[in-house]
Every structure is written in structure tokens, then in C-alpha cells.
UniProtKB/Swiss-Prot annotation:
Keywords: Aromatic hydrocarbons catabolism, Lyase, Manganese, Metal-binding. The record marks R21 as: Transition state stabilizer. It comes from the Bacteria. Mn(2+) binds at D22, H204, H206. NCBIfam families: 4OH_2_O_val_ald, PRK08195.1. This is 4-hydroxy-2-oxovalerate aldolase 3. The lineage of its organism: Bacteria, Pseudomonadati, Pseudomonadota, Gammaproteobacteria, Pseudomonadales. Residues 13-265 form the Pyruvate carboxyltransferase domain. Its EC number is 4.1.3.39. Substrate binds at R21, D22, S175, H204, Y295. Belongs to the 4-hydroxy-2-oxovalerate aldolase family. The keyword Glycoprotein does not apply. It comes from Azotobacter vinelandii (strain DJ / ATCC BAA-1303).
Length: 350
């Protein structure tokens, strides 16, 4: 009988590193240009073909709601792109937050790939942005966030819409780190059934239930050819799929990634870990994100709300999960924490 590793032997997978975009969340958006260059050039030398570089919330992300980075997206992108020898710089664009004008600026600064991201039921907000990215000649992916909140048939319909707008790759995005391998397989498989053979499928995982690697392998089994991850797992919540660990698993299974495993390990240990303000791991609160199906970016916001209102962050996160709050509703974290504090007699009503 053919084993799992035998069935994937020789399969080619493209890595896309997120530590300079998703990792901004874990660093409270405080990564400097020189740090960006150091990380990106090391990833480039390790053979990583795509490196995402923006504010954590993507183009247009600098704001009161999402936090302010020390530099503009244009400064980050331009500085990194100028140093790349083989890797392409990518960006995140959420329609309604980022604009086509900002995408043009990112392209002018050297970005050549984009994740156009919508909630998993709102692909119809992305046609203009996807079409514009294709017009610029960018490698263009549709990115269905919080994919656990739509069933496989729904994900297939949304992915088909993104493909019709011009997306060359469609992502199943486990923003909450909630999914298990069978959930990933069902959604990726549903996409593979309806998308054209030439349209790629990607998977973006978070490690909140410790399933980032298993889910990424499940995605490949079901037909995905692009996998997002982050060296040392630097990302929101318990981090993204740790790329160097995933690379080692792929090598064991005979999956062709094209990256230098030992160099990736060195980037993680020598550059990323010393940058961390806190160890990005599965802790009480990040585990709650995965358990309750909450957007991973809410982690630090909820911890700050807990300090302010005296309600445990875990309780806040469970309530946000019950309400099915999604990315972009960060303002509701404070509102929820305040309401819970009032209900518990911790805060006097005005």
C-alpha cells in the first residue's frame, strides 16, 4: 500500500514567507527597515521565492485601528525589493482598506505579487483590485480569509468568482488557526474540482491548534501548490506555519520546495528569534483563538483590552468567537470587553 509520503514524493510546492507582514502583528507593527532588509536578504539567499512585505494589515494598514508602523509600506517595499536577487516581493491588499492607487505605488516600488484578501463570503468585493493587479502584470492571488466560516461548496463558489476576476491562484486561508486536516482537504478539494487546471491553489495556516504543518500537508494532498508560512512562525496568534519546520517535513516526504533547509533554520535561529518581543507559541490565549475560531490578529488587542477592563483575554476571545467577529472589526474587541466588564460589575455604567 502506498504511504502518504510516497504519494507526495516529487510534488513541487512554492513557499511564500509571511514573517515581514504577518510577523508585523506579533511585533506590534514595529519592524524597522534595516531589520526588514536583513530578514529578506537571508530568505532570498535561502531560496524562498516569495516574501510578503507590508504593514500587518497590508496596504493602507497604517491607522489608529490597526496601529502605525515606523515606516510607510512604500519605504519597506522599495528597500527590500532593491536587495532581492531571486525572490519576488509580495503585498497584501484588503479591498476597502488598501486601494488600487496604493497597489500602483507598491508596484512602482518593486512589488510583483499580491494577495487580494476578502472575507470568505465576500469575494465580490475584489474584482476591480484583482483585475488591476493583473493589468500591472503582477502574480495575483485571491485570498479567502477565515475560510472555516464557509463550507467547502461555498469556498468553491467564492474561489470561482475570484478566478473569473483574473486570480491566478486562490487561497484557503485559516486566519483563526481553527481548521483540522479534514477541513482543509474538503475546502482545497472543492476548489480543485471547480477551478481550471492552470489556476493554482494556496493554503495559509496559523498554528493556534498546533496544526499548521499537518494542515499544510493536507492542503498539498488535496491539490494545493502554494504554501504560506513564516520562518520561526513569526506571525499573528501562535504564528503561521513555521516555514523551516515545514521545509524539513517536506524534505522527509520527498516534496520539492527548492529552498535551502539549513539556511532557513539559520534565519529562524539567528535573525528572527532575537527579534521577538515575546515567544510566539501556543499559549492560553492563542490556543483560545484556534479553539474558538477567532481571527489571529485579535490576540494582542484582546490582551490589551483585558488589562484595561479586568476581563480575562480568554473570555473576551471566546465571546468574539461566539459573535463570529472577523478581520476589520478590531473596534469590537474593546466594545465586547467593556460590555463584559459591565455585566460582571467591573465597570460602572455612565
Amino acid at each position: 500500500m502506498m504511504s502518504q509520503s510516497d504519494s507526495l514524493k516529487g510534488r513541487k510546492v512554492v513557499f511564500h514567507d509571511m514573517c515581514l507582514r504577518d510577523g508585523m502583528h506579533a511585533k506590534r507593527e514595529q519592524i524597522g527597515v534595516e531589520q526588514m532588509i536583513a530578514v529578506a536578504t537571508a530568505l532570498d539567499a535561502a531560496g524562498v521565492p516569495y516574501i510578503q512585505v507590508t504593514h500587518g494589515a497590508g496596504l493602507g494598514g497604517n491607522s489608529l485601528q490597526h496601529g502605525f508602523a515606523p515606516h510607510s509600506n512604500e519605504e519597506y517595499i522599495g528597500a527590500v525589493a532593491a536587495k532581492m536577487k531571486q525572490a519576488k516581493v509580495s503585498v497584501l491588499l484588503i479591498p476597502g482598506l488598501g486601494t488600487m492607487k496604493e497597489l500602483q505605488s507598491a508596484f512602482d516600488c518593486g512589488a510583483r505579487s499580491v494577495h487580494v484578501a476578502t472575507h470568505c463570503t465576500e469575494a465580490d468585493t475584489s474584482p476591480q483590485h484583482i483585475a488591476f493587479a493583473r493589468k500591472l502584470g503582477m502574480d495575483t492571488s485571491g485570498f479567502l480569509m477565515m475560510s472555516h466560516l464557509n463550507d467547502p461548496a461555498g469556498i468553491a463558489r467564492q474561489g470561482k468568482l475570484m478566478e473569473s476576476y483574473g486570480a491566478q491562484t486562490v487561497y484557503v486561508t485559516d486566519s483563526a488557526g481553527y481548521m483540522l486536516p479534514e477541513d482543509v482537504k474538503a475546502r482545497v478539494g472543492a476548489l480543485r474540482e471547480v477551478l481550471a487546471p492552470e489556476t493554482g491553489i494556496g493554503f495559509h495556516g496559523h498554528h493556534n491548534l498546533g496544526m499548521g504543518i499537518a494542515n499544510s500537508i493536507a492542503a498539498i494532498e488535496a491539490g494545493a501548490s502554494r504554501i504560506d508560512g513564516s520562518v520561526a512562525g513569526l506571525g499573528a496568534g501562535a504564528g503561521n506555519t513555521p516555514l523551516e519546520v515545514f521545509a524539513a517535513v517536506c524534505e522527509r516526504m520527498g516534496i520539492d520546495t527548492g529552498v535551502d533547509l539549513f539556511r532557513l533554520m539559520d534565519v529562524a535561529e539567528d535573525i528572527i528569534v532575537p527579534m521577538m518581543e515575546h515567544v510566539v507559541r501556543v499559549d492560553r490565549e492563542s490556543l483560545t483563538l484556534g479553539y474558538a475560531g477567532v481571527y489571529s490578529t485579535f490576540l494582542l488587542h484582546s490582551k490589551r483590552a483585558a488589562e484595561r477592563f479586568g476581563v480575562p483575554a480568554r473570555d473576551i476571545l471566546v465571546e468574539l468567537g461566539r459573535k463570529k467577529m472577523i478581520g476589520g472589526q478590531e473596534d469590537m474587541i474593546l466594545d465586547t470587553a467593556m460590555s463584559m466588564a459591565k455585566a460582571r460589575g467591573l465597570l460602572k455604567s455612565a
